[in-house]
A protein has these predicted regions:
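Interfacial helix-loop-helix hairpins and adjacent transmembrane helices
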Residues: 1-25, 350-405, 409, 415, ...
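Extracytoplasmic
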Residues: 59, 63, 88, 132-237, ...
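Internal alpha-helical transmembrane segments of multipass membrane proteins
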Residues: 212-245, 249-253, 320-325, 607-638, ...
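Hydrophobic transmembrane alpha-helices and their membrane-interface caps
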Residues: 239-287, 631-681, 713-714, 740-743
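Juxtamembrane segments of multi-pass membrane proteins
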Residues: 384-522
Length: 754
C-alpha cells in the first residue's frame, strides 16, 4: 500500500509540475520571513544548564556581590609603561571605556590607593590614601608598592611591572556583543600600546565570530570544492547543479525555520549548517546515482525514485531519532540543536524528493558511459582483498573491538577555551598574557557564610570614633584567621592564578601595622575607618554582602595550564573547605562560571553516552523492522558503533579532550555511518551480488564520502581549532564508514544466509 502511494506520487510529478513547484516556492517564501531572525547566540547563558542548582547559587551570588561578568584589558608598552604620559593616555582610555553601554565600572591602577608615600602607622593611614594622577607621587615607588600589594598585584599590574590591566566589570545583561565591539573600537585608537582584550565574557563572543567567519569563508570554498569534485565524478554540470541547488534550498528553508522558531546557533550547535550540508549532499547523490545507474537499464526515473525512497526514508528517520533524542537533555542549546537537526533532516528529505524529481523532469541526467570511481575501487582493491577479508575479518574484529572499547575510556572531559584558537590570533595572545601575567581567566567563587550571632558591645571598643562599631562576623579575628588559612591553601593550587578576598585587604593592613597581626580592635578600625571611603566601599561590596555574614573568595583559573582539569580542581577545593570547616557553623558554596562550565561538560558527556546508547538501540529496532531481520539490524548497528569507537579512540591516543565543540563529532559518525550502512545493506540484500551492489549503492557511498572528505580538508586552514578538528574527525568517521560498509558489511550480512 505504502509503496503504491510512493509510486503514484512520483508518477504524478510529470503531470503536476506547476503544483509541486508552487509548493517549493511557497516553502521558500514562508521561510524567508524568518531569515532576518536567524542569529548566533554568543551569550554565556548558552554554556550553562537551565535547571542547574549551581546556576541558582551563581545567580544568588551575583545578587549579593554584584555581577561577576567581566573583561580584562592587558596593556603593554615597548618602553617603560609606568610614565606620566602613558598613565594620562591610559586614564583617557579608562574614561572612554567607562561610558560604553554595558560597562558598569573599570578597576585599574587609578583606583588603587597608594598608602606608603609616606608610610604611616595603621591608624594614620586612614587619611593617607593617595591616587595616581590625583596626588603628587613618586611613580617608581608607587609602581613598586602596587607590585608588592597583596590586593592589586596581578589584578591591575603584573609582578614584573611590564603589564597593566583594566578589569572591566559588566552590568549583568545577557549579551555583550556590542559592548565588546565598542571596547575594541576604542582600543584601536591607542596605537602606542599593545593591548589585548580577553576574559570569560568575550570567549563565547569570539568563538561565535570565528564560527561565523569559518561558515562564510570555508563554507564558500567547501561548496566550490564540492562542485569541482562532483563534476569530475559525474562529468556533467546538470547533476552537480541539482545537488548544490537542493542543498541551497534545504539550508535556506531550514535557516528560515530556525529564525521563525527562535532557535539560535550557539557553540554547542555550531556545526548545524555543516551537518545539514553533509546530509543534503548525501541524499542527493544517492538519488542521482540510483537514477543514473538505472538509466543504463532503461528503468524509468519514477521507478528509480520509488526504489531509492525507502532506504532514504529510513536513513532520515534513524538520523531524526538520533538527533531528537537530544531533546531529552537538560541543556537548552543541546535541546535546540536536537530540534534543529531533526527539522533540518526532515526538510532535507522532503525537499530532495520534491525538488530533484522536478529538476529531472526539466532535464534528465546522462547515463553512465565510462568507468567510474566504483569500477576503480572494485578492480583495484576490492577484488584483491576480498579473499583476505573473508578469512581475517573475525580475528581482526576480536582484536580491534576490545581496543576501541578500551581506548575511549581514557578520554578526558575538559574545556580549555584557549585551545580553540590559533596562537597568532588576538584572543589567544590576550588569554595567554592574562594567564601568565594577570592571574588567570575563568572565575571561581567560594562563598563562605556565617550564622546569625548575638553581638555584645564593649564600650571600650568604641574609642576609635563615634560611629565605630565592634568587630563582627568576618571582621572578628577568629573568623578572619579561618578565612586567611583557607585562602592560603587554595592559593597554592597550581591551576589557580589570582585569589582575592577581604583577607588580602587585611594582609595590606598588617603591612601598614609593621607586619603585626591584627586583633578585633584593629579589624574593626580597618572596616570602619580604613575602608570607609567611597572607592573602598565599592570594592568591598564585591567581596562581602551587606549583612557582612557572607564573604567571597574570588579566584581565576590558568586556562593555559597543561594540567587543568576543572572537575578535579573543584573536588580539590571542596576537600580543602571540608577539612577546614568540618564541625564549624561556617557554610560554603563553590560557584562561578568555572563551575557552570564544568557542570555543562559533565552533563554533555553523560547525556552523550545515554544518547548514543539510545540511538544505537533505536537504529537496531528500526532497521530490524525495515529489513524484517534482527541480524540485519545488528549488522547495520555494528557499522556506526565501530566508526564511533575508531574516532573516540583516535581522540584518546592524540590526547584531544571531549569538550563543548568536539563532543558532537560522535553524532556525525553515527549519522553518516548509518546512512552508508542502510543504503549498502538495502541494495546488497536485493541484488545478492557484491559487484552490482558496489557499482550502484557503493558508487553513491564513494562519491558522497570522498566529496565530503575533500571539502572538509579545506577546514585544515582555519584559525579556529574546533573547525579543524571537526573537519579531520568527520573525515575519519566518513572514511571508516565507507570502508566498513563496503568491505565488512557484506561479510556480516552473509552470515544470515548460512
Amino acid at each position: 500500500m505504502f509503496k503504491k502511494l510512493v509510486s503514484n506520487y512520483f508518477n504524478s510529478i510529470k503531470d503536476r509540475k506547476f503544483f509541486y513547484s508552487a509548493i517549493i516556492l511557497f516553502g521558500i517564501f514562508c521561510s524567508s520571513l524568518g531569515i532576518n531572525n536567524f542569529r548566533f547566540d554568543a551569550s554565556s547563558e548558552t554554556l550553562i544548564l537551565d535547571n542547574d542548582v549551581d546556576y541558582q547559587i551563581y545567580q544568588q551570588s551575583n545578587d549579593d556581590f554584584g555581577s561577576s561578568d567581566f573583561l580584562i584589558l592587558a596593556i603593554q608598552s615597548p618602553n617603560e609603561i609606568f610614565t606620566l604620559d602613558n598613565l594620562q593616555n591610559l586614564q583617557n582610555l579608562r574614561d572612554k571605556i567607562q561610558v560604553i553601554e554595558g560597562v558598569d565600572s573599570v578597576v585599574s591602577v587609578f583606583d588603587a590607593p597608594i598608602l606608603e608615600q609616606p608610610k604611616l602607622s595603621l591608624i594614620k593611614s586612614a587619611s593617607n590614601d593617595k591616587y595616581l594622577l590625583e596626588d603628587e607621587l613618586n611613580l617608581p615607588l608607587a609602581k613598586q608598592e602596587l607590585i608588592d600589594s597583596p590586593i592589586f598585584s596581578e589584578l591591575v599590574i603584573s609582578k614584573d611591572g611590564k603589564t597593566l590591566a583594566f578589569q572591566i566589570n559588566l552590568d549583568g545583561k545577557d549579551n555583550y556583543d556590542q559592548t565588546v565591539i565598542d571596547i575594541r573600537s576604542e582600543i584601536r585608537t591607542f596605537k602606542n600600546f599593545n593591548i589585548n582584550l580577553a576574559g570569560p565574557s568575550m570567549i563565547v563572543f569570539d568563538t561565535i565570530n570565528f564560527i561565523k567567519n569559518d561558515v562564510i569563508t570555508f563554507g564558500t570554498i567547501t561548496v566550490l570544492v564540492f562542485f569541482i569534485f562532483l563534476y569530475l565524478i559525474f562529468r556533467d554540470f546538470w547533476p552537480v547543479t541539482i545537488i548544490l541547488l537542493n542543498a541551497l534550498i534545504v539550508m535556506f528553508i531550514s535557516i528560515g525555520v530556525m529564525g521563525l522558531m527562535d532557535w539560535p546557533i550557539s557553540i554547542v550547535s555550531s556545526n548545524f549548517l555543516a551537518l545539514l550540508l553533509i546530509t543534503s549532499i548525501a541524499i542527493s547523490i544517492h538519488i542521482l546515482a540510483k537514477v543514473q545507474t538505472d538509466g543504463d537499464k532503461n528503468i524509468s526515473t519514477s521507478k528509480s525514485l520509488s526504489d531509492i525512497f525507502m532506504p532514504c526514508l529510513f536513513t532520515a528517520l534513524t538520523t531524526i531519532v538520533g538527533f531528537a533524542s537530544l531533546i531529552l537533555s537538560d541543556i537548552k542549546p543541546v535541546i535546540d540543536f536536537g530540534k534543529m537537526m531533526s527539522v533540518g533532516v526532515l526538510l532535507n528529505l522532503l525537499s530532495s524528493f520534491l525538488f530533484i524529481p522536478l529538476a529531472l523532469e526539466l532535464k534528465n541526467i546522462k547515463s553512465l558511459t565510462q568507468k567510474n570511481i566504483a569500477d576503480f575501487v572494485y578492480n583495484n582493491g576490492y577484488v584483491q582483498s576480498k579473499g583476505f577479508i573473508k578469512k581475517a575479518w573475525i580475528p581482526f574484529l576480536l582484536i580491534f573491538i576490545p581496543l576501541i572499547i578500551y581506548l575511549p575510556t581514557n578520554l578526558k572531559v575538559e574545556n580549555k577555551f584557549i585551545d580553540y584558537f590559533n596562537k597568532e590570533t588576538e584572543i589567544y595572545m590576550g588569554m595567554e598574557t592574562i594567564d601568565k601575567n594577570l592571574g588567570g581567566t575563568t572565575p571561581f567563587d567560594i562563598i563562605l557564610s556565617l550564622p546569625e550571632a548575638i553581638e555584645e558591645v564593649d564600650e571600650e571598643d568604641l574609642f576609635f570614633s563615634e560611629n565605630s562599631e565592634t568587630a563582627k562576623y568576618w571582621w572578628k579575628k577568629e573568623n578572619m584567621d579561618k578565612l586567611q588559612k583557607v585562602q592560603n591553601e587554595v592559593s597554592k593550587l597550581d591551576e589557580l592564578g589570582k585569589v582575592l578576598s577581604i583577607a588580602n585587604g587585611i594582609e595590606l593592613a598588617q603591612n601598614l601595622n609593621n607586619n603585626q597581626p591584627l586583633g578585633d580592635l584593629e579589624l574593626a578600625f580597618v572596616r570602619n575607618s580604613l575602608l570607609d571611603s567611597e572607592r573602598a566601599q565599592k570594592v568591598l561590596e564585591t567581596f562581602i554582602d551587606e549583612t557582612e555574614k557572607s564573604t567571597k573568595i574570588f579566584a581565576r583559573t590558568i586556562d593555559s595550564s597543561p594540567n587543568l582539569n576543572r572537575n578535579e580542581l573543584i573536588n580539590t577545593i571542596d576537600k580543602i573547605l571540608q577539612k577546614n570547616f568540618k564541625g564549624t557553623e561556617i557554610d560554603y558554596q563553590i560557584t562561578g562560571l568555572g563551575v557552570l562550565y564544568n557542570n555543562l561538560l559533565q552533563s554533555l558527556f553523560s547525556s552523550q553516552i545515554k544518547t548514543l546508547s539510545f540511538v544505537l538501540v533505536s537504529i537496531f529496532l528500526m532497521v530490524s523492522f525495515l529489513f524484517r531481520s534482527l541480524l540485519v539490524g545488528f549488522s547495520v548497528m555494528f557499522i556506526p558503533s565501530i566508526s564511533v569507537g575508531v574516532v573516540m579512540s583516535s581522540m584518546s591516543v592524540l590526547n584531544i579532550p571531549l569538550d563543548i565543540m568536539t563532543i558532537t563529532i560522535a553524532s556525525i559518525c553515527v549519522g553518516m555511518s548509518v546512512d552508508y550502512a542502510i543504503h549498502f545493506a538495502w541494495r546488497y540484500l536485493k541484488e545478492n551480488d557484491e559487484k552490482k551492489t558496489l557499482l550502484s549503492a557503493g558508487r553513491a557511498i564513494l562519491i558522497t564520502g570522498f566529496t565530503i572528505i575533500m571539502g572538509f580538508l579545506v577546514f585544515l586552514f582555519s584559525n579556529f581549532n574546533p573547525t579543524i578538528l571537526f573537519g579531520v574527525f568527520s573525515g575519519i568517521a566518513i572514511f571508516f564508514a565507507m570502508l566498513l560498509s563496503i568491505y565488512l558489511l557484506p561479510r556480516i550480512l552473509d552470515l544470515q544466509s548460512k
